[in-house]
Amino acid sequence: MQKNQRTTAQPIGAILFDAYGTLFDVYSVALLAEELFPGRGQAVSVMWRDKQIEYTNLVSTSSHGAHYQPFWNLTRSALRYACKRLGPDLNAEAEDALMNQYRHLSAFPENRDVLQALKARGIVTGILSNGDPAMLAAAVESAGLRDLLDHVISVDAIRKYKTHPDAYSLGPQVIGLPPEQIAFVSCNSWDALAATWFGYQTLWVNRYQLPFEELGTQPLHTGSSLRDVLALPGLTRAPV
């Protein structure tokens, strides 16, 4: 794990994880997409994800949230756009199959070991996600992580998506700790950046060896897998 900023870490009492891309592999739908759309499945899955994120930003910034839609709805709309853009015929059966796959995304293999280690240290664990409550409940249950998460926080409660500051403020509100005593972990660079601006101790899980955003701010730490969470300096000062 790489430390990007020279700061003295405060004790970490809680760790919040982004869900989609961080705990759950959003590109695991590519296998099914390739079965349904031979030769175009990978491209569909990538555009689907990109358009999904674009839609969350769009509805969060337009008319003060007047156009908010639940994440499930935006995910379906993004899938339809990707298929229209790239050409494969998305019939109702294929759409339902892909959406069901998204509801039960594959979890990354290290998730359970990392969460168990954190719980053994007395760390509060949770998810802070754009996903709506029903989506998150299904994903957590499917991955077998329910017993290892103290909180599953959805931005649906405030109808504002990350990267809006109000979305990140849900963490301290629910957990009862200041953001500097909460670590926020995400594989999405835009998410890690906004969480850093908000004041969390941040870890960007750079699974795909990508460059970070060019906006003058780095996350506090960069790693390559979820296991790097266990090396966060603030954990050494946390109660065990």
Language-model-detected regions and their locations in the chain:
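Short helix-capping segments at alpha-helix termini
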Residues: F37-G41, R85-L90, G144-L148, G176-L177
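Hydrophobic alpha-helical core bundles mediating ligand binding, dimerization, or RNAP-core interactions
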Residues: A33, W48-Q52, T75, L98-Y102, ...
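Short, acidic loop-to-helix structural element flanking the phosphoryl-transfer center
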Residues: W72-N73, L90-I127, A137, P165
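Active-site neighborhood of HAD-like aspartate-dependent phosphohydrolases
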Residues: K3-I53
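Hydrophobic side chains within well-formed alpha-helices
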Residues: V29, V44, A94, L145-L148
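A metal-dependent, Asp-based hydrolase signature
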Residues: Q42, Y55-D96
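Alpha-helical elements of Rossmann-like donor-binding domains used by nucleotide-donor carbohydrate transfer enzymes
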Residues: L31-L32, M47, S77-Y81, A97, ...
